[in-house]
């Protein structure tokens, strides 16, 4: 619904180039699927990995349907057919989500001793996530340096994702609190697969808007870092 709201705003105010650019950036931050690495942070925070993994798979499948439906309305130049765009999104989602999942299942089935050794390495998943984050941060800085936009537009592309990030974390935690799953719900809605978001922006929307999902990486991981610090210091989260 938030992504649909952004589509309406683009229709209403998209005649101005800079305004449309910022709105496209916000739109992609809303419509990005849940990050595959969300389970790493959720486990650290004490959330439910099982329910979150199920949600992540469902959310990524839903993304393959809704993105081809909305993108032609956001960017007129995105004249790729529904089936073609679905296939392209499916290929990307499969690469970052389904293939690692299948490899994990096959490893547990045929290489149980090796899996046990990997599981015994303390915080391995966390450090791998940090390594991936470093690459994404570098990509974000590169996009910023090469973006030919005004200073005001650049600031909006950097700070509008902060509002989007806080809003999605807040909505997820508020809804999840009613079901005793505020941590899992907050991470599910707030932690986005910005790799897919950047790819979608560069492929189908205005490439300059890719600064927004890149900035979202920074904000969501500042939120994650604060949560991890708070959990480590006080033993539980306040929100």
Predicted regions and their residues:
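Alpha-helical transmembrane segments of multi-pass small-molecule/ion transporters
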Residues: 1-239
């Amino acid at each position: 619904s938030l992504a649909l709201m952004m589509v309406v705003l683009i229709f209403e105010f998209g005649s101005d180039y800079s305004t449309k650019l910022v709105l496209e950036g916000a739109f992609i931050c809303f419509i990005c699927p849940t990050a595959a690495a969300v389970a790493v942070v959720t486990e650290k925070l004490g959330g439910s990995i099982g329910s979150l993994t199920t949600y992540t798979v469902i959310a990524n499948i839903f993304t393959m349907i809704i993105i081809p439906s909305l993108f032609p309305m956001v960017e007129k130049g995105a004249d790729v057919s529904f089936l073609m765009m679905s296939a392209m999104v499916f290929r990307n989602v499969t690469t970052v989500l389904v293939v690692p999942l299948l490899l994990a299942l096959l490893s547990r089935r045929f290489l149980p001793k090796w899996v046990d050794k990997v599981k015994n390495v303390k915080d391995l998943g966390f450090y791998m996530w940090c390594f991936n984050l470093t690459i994404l941060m570098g990509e974000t800085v590169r996009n910023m340096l090469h973006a030919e936009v005004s200073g005001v537009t650049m600031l909006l592309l950097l700070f509008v994702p902060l509002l989007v990030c806080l809003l999605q974390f807040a909505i997820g935690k508020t809804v999840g609190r009613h079901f005793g799953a505020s941590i899992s719900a907050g991470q599910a809605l707030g932690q986005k697969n910005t790799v897919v978001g950047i790819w979608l922006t560069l492929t189908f929307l205005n490439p300059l808007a890719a600064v927004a999902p890149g900035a979202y990486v920074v904000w969501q991981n500042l939120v994650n870092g604060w949560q991890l610090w708070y959990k480590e210091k006080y033993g539980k989260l306040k929100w």
